[in-house]
Amino acid sequence: MSKLDEDVQKIGDKLVFNPYNTNNKEITTQEIKNILKQYGVPCNIYNDKLYKRAFVHKSYVKKPLLENESENILVVEKPHNCLPLSTKSNERLEFLGDGVLECITKYYLYRTYPKENEGFMTEKKIAIVKNEHIGRIAYEMGLH
């Protein structure tokens, strides 16, 4: 068995898509509220689906049937103890969030360093918003 990419494996002469993971669980609305409260974010949740989607990795999303058939990929049936695959991942929300985070960071740096030039602020912004830094913060917050 050889790994072709994150979610498709070659088993013998067949390609098999098996994204299921018994450790995956859907975040509850109460867990979302607890996280927001813990970090002092005043928020009424009107659409918990957006918050829940923020926790869906692209590897846990349904592959279109035609894509699987055209590539001759066998899709494993969902085990009884696993969440069903999602129709959407967090990718688009991540794109939007990255833009918001960058905007807030730029504003903060602009106000904090009024005498510095844009090159200085750009270097600081890059250091603050890089994935490793944000990943570490998310891990420390328990968002892993």
What are these regions (language model features)?
Residues 2-144:
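RNase III-family endoribonuclease catalytic core
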